[in-house]
Amino acid sequence: MTSKFRVLGAGVWGLAFSDYLLKLGHKVEVFRRDTKLSNKDITELKLYHISDDNIKSLDSLNDQKSNGEINIIAVNSKGFSELLNKHESYFRTLNEVVSLTKGLDHLSWKYFSDYVAGMFTNINKYGLISGPSFAKDLCYEKKISVSFATLDEELSSSMVDATKSSYFEMIPTTYIYHIEIAGIIKNIAAILCGMADKYYSKGVYSNVIIKKACQETWQKGIEAFNGYDGPIDVLNKDRDSIITSPGCIGDMILTCKQDQSRNYQFGKLIADADVSIEDAKSIVGTVEGYDCCITIIEKTQSTEGELSNLLYKIIKSQNTKREKLLRDFLQA
């Protein structure tokens, strides 16, 4: 069955996913600032089905009428709240939204699912796509399983069915908070893995850090339900399935062990005492783990989190003390 999609603010992942949807025979409109597909990062992808005809200016979004499309947010995390605020009149016409973007809004300190719920009472269906994959993996038809987190069974069924192929599948889950939190903590863990791989043989401490990342994800997910015994009892029963989902440990393993992860690259750079934090950021670009770590520690009321606390100490310490902080933590 053919579905209609609108992909909003698409970077390379959003474009790769749009190309995949077109390959499956769906109708896709992509709204982005740059309406040309000539960017180097884009031309390096194998995008065989998308063309300039599919691209519309993001500035025109408020003028669009909603006609049963599935809207997928595909901006980076820093652009999430900006997209919703700038195009508020468009989002007021929707009752469901799917997101490829996960993280924290650094001004309100809310998870994106909460940000949407607080801003738009009309949006009563929210879905999150998260899992172990890079954009080029989808373009090269690498076998991929991702989590699709939503509380709405109809949205879950429609997304799972519309996107399934011989090499791509969505695994449904209702645990949005844990999948969203895992997407934040994996980037913090990837920075620490990058540092550890610079100080030790590659991969020696990766599994230790990933295990702690899973524990931190679990703890922060439980925090969201403090005071509600019923949901926590259910969470405890489903703990293993949550942790082992593609959007949790699957995503962490990929991000923490791959050189192409920007957070991992950032970690390797700051492992060198001669490289400042700011220089490393300018080399790598947006570092989600760095930004989220600052927000978690300085802005939120969260108390749990070994890895968040450790990374915060590292990025606030003198350059020469970074190595000792990490070594002491790993060898404790």
Question: Residue ranges of each PLM-predicted region?
Answer:
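Fold-independent oxyanion-binding glycine-rich loops
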Residues: 10, 33, 75, 100-103, ...
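Rossmann-like NAD(P)(H) cofactor-binding subdomain of soluble oxidoreductases
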Residues: 51-143, 159-161
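Anion (oxyanion) recognition and catalysis
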Residues: 22, 164, 301
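Internal alpha-helical scaffold of NAD(P)-dependent oxidoreductase catalytic cores
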Residues: 27, 79, 90, 115, ...
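NAD(P)+-binding Rossmann beta1-loop-alpha1 motif at the extreme N-terminus of oxidoreductases
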Residues: 1-60
